[in-house]
């Protein structure tokens, strides 16, 4: 990105008027946040993407962490973050301007031992009960697209607990997370395919048009140059997290 100092000054004025870029980070996505630094800051693909934005702008970075993506999205109008790294979804886009995705994560279902459900299409049937983490990007997709099955929403890992304890027919989740769950549930299976891919993007609150254009250009260059792929490899999430096209 070869920007004039005038344009960079406009971007800084919208994204970091105090000289600090406040980056909203969703801690619940273990593929994108894989640990903590010695200073206690989040570490992983998403924090590194945010840090690179700050470096390009020659400003300091401050990580603003959230337990769930829904909480991060809800804070878009509270002036607590300047960029937010979460899944881009239409509901969230009412208050957030998103870039195109920089990475994708498949979402699918886990079914218990003995389940008659064998495909993604089998799940959306009358009488089928799906446990899903509330406010996750894929939960928003299911809310918009499931026509016959019943959705049971719970906060975070409680969706898994309810799936096991209440005997639901399917657990919706990111494939990489379900791979860990299936090992703890003898006979359970992860269905082939996906019902959606979560599009991980960078967003900024509505009304920051110059900043939004800068972020869009940054993401496209980060993908094209191989920077996103390098981060994915560096943090050991290759094969579970993929660069978006």
Where in this protein do the model-derived segments appear?
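Short loop->beta-strand "edge-of-pocket" segments that line small-molecule binding or catalytic clefts
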Residues: 20-26, 43, 121-138, 150-151
């Amino acid at each position: 990105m070869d920007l004039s100092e005038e344009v960079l000054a406009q971007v800084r004025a919208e994204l970091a008027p105090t000289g600090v870029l406040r980056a909203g980070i969703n801690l619940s996505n273990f593929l994108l946040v894989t640990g903590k630094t010695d200073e206690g800051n989040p570490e992983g693909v998403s924090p590194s993407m945010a840090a690179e934005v700050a470096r390009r702008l020659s400003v300091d970075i401050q990580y603003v962490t959230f337990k769930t993506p829904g909480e991060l999205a809800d804070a878009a109008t509270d002036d607590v973050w300047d960029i937010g790294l979460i899944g881009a979804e239409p509901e969230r886009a009412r208050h957030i301007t998103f870039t195109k995705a920089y990475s994708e994560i498949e979402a699918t279902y886990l079914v218990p031992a003995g389940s008659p459900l064998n495909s993604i299409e089998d799940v959306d049937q009358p009488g089928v009960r799906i446990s899903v983490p509330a406010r996750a990007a894929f939960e928003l997709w299911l809310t918009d697209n499931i026509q016959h099955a019943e959705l049971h929403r719970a906060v975070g890992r409680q969706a898994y607990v309810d799936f096991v304890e209440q005997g639901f027919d399917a657990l919706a989740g990111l494939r990489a997370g379900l791979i860990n769950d299936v090992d703890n549930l003898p006979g359970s299976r992860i269905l082939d395919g996906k019902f959606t891919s979560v599009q991980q993007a960078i967003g900024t609150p509505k009304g920051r048009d110059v900043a939004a254009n800068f972020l869009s250009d940054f993401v496209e260059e980060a993908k094209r140059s191989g920077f996103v792929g390098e981060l994915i490899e560096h943090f050991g999430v290759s094969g579970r997290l993929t660069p978006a096209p």
